[in-house]
Amino acid sequence: MFGFVTAPFDLNLRHLRAVSAIAARGSMSAAAEAVSLSQPALTQGLAKLERSLGATLFERHADGMRATPQGVLAAQRAEAAFGHLARSVRGAAHGGARGFARPELLMTATQLRAFLAVADAGSFAAAAEATALSQPAIHRAVRDLEQLCAASLVERRGRGVILSPTGIRLARGVRLARVELVALIAETGAEAAGSGMLVIGAMPLCRALILPAAIAQFTRAMPRMKIDVVEGSWRELVDPLRDGILDVMVGALRETAPPECDQSPLFVDRLNVVARAGHPLAGTAIPSLDQLASYPWIVGQPGTPLRLQWEALFAERTLPHAPVECGSVMVIRGVLADTDFLTLLSPDQVALEVDRGLLSTIGGRLERSIRTIGITTRTSWRPTVAQAYFLDLLRDVSRAAGLQENR
């Protein structure tokens, strides 16, 4: 009877290594030797893995083992997962300590789950509670990983722990490996079609228009997919993206893609000066820079696209007084409604407030205030079919939004 695994670290890592070995060598005996298992043990392990996934990964032929389409996908994802682990522990041994040549090949799923729980929770007690493992089991798992890596992974701080530099690298590798295992389950499992998870980092502009429309269409087409939306600024989201906590970020792109990330533009957005309804400049068709500079401003944090656009607007004169730095559109709206402050925002971000007569745009869209809105992903990320479909929906919705803007 086929089952279905939902937790990535319920999978046996040695059996996953065997999947890659069988696919590469086409032989159970050669694969068994490669992963240091007897052939009967490998046969049993493969059967257990196939039952857990609810999928047939290999077919036996006269000339050896041949991977099914699901087996090919599983082998690719397993290779990617072990690749992330290998890179995270490369050169980890400290102080001349002699570690294992390939520690990632000796790690167990239980060890990785326990270590990641400590990394996320910040203490052994909280990690034990989160995983239903005992504290001694958590301690033992982390200690075993430290022996494999020949390096300290955690450091005590009061009642909790923090990760050492080696621990930080390993935690990222484990998270990225987990992403691959989640994708493996989604692509090969008994309910593979249209199932799985997508974690989206949502920056301010995309929350106003693009993302809600894309999610609405996506959930109608793929009701079994789970979507988790994490809101934040670019600075708050980029490290979780690189760590594998997020799958994709949607919002304003940077001039240069951050390390280990790729950027894909969706459309170009132009900004407006925004103020409260009834502001002294409301109704001014083309306000001068002197007029705009005579009022206080709310601006973005240094280095953010909104801040750079504001600085460019006043490049030919002294910057106006800007006592408030804020990246929260909700807070900005509230301050604007009760003051004579000005700010730069996309009209889409304040469309509802403008329609209700709470805020107003001053003048037209600023021709030089161009922001490219798009998708940021990890360079190593390979989306599942369902995740790739969501990206296509984002592009479709964005094209429609772009056409409306250019009318």
Residue ranges and their predicted role:
Residues 362-404:
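A late-sequence structural motif
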Residues 281, 295-317, 383-392, 401-407:
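Secondary-structure junction motif
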Residues 106, 235-271, 360:
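Short beta-strand-centered segments that line the small-molecule binding cleft or hinge
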Residues 50-67, 146-163:
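A short LG(V/I)-centered, amphipathic sequence patch enriched
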Residues 92-111, 190-207, 222-225, 270:
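Interdomain hinge and pocket-entrance segments immediately C-terminal to HTH DNA-binding domains
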Residues 121, 126, 130-136, 140-143, ...:
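Central regulatory/effector-binding core of bacterial HTH transcription factors
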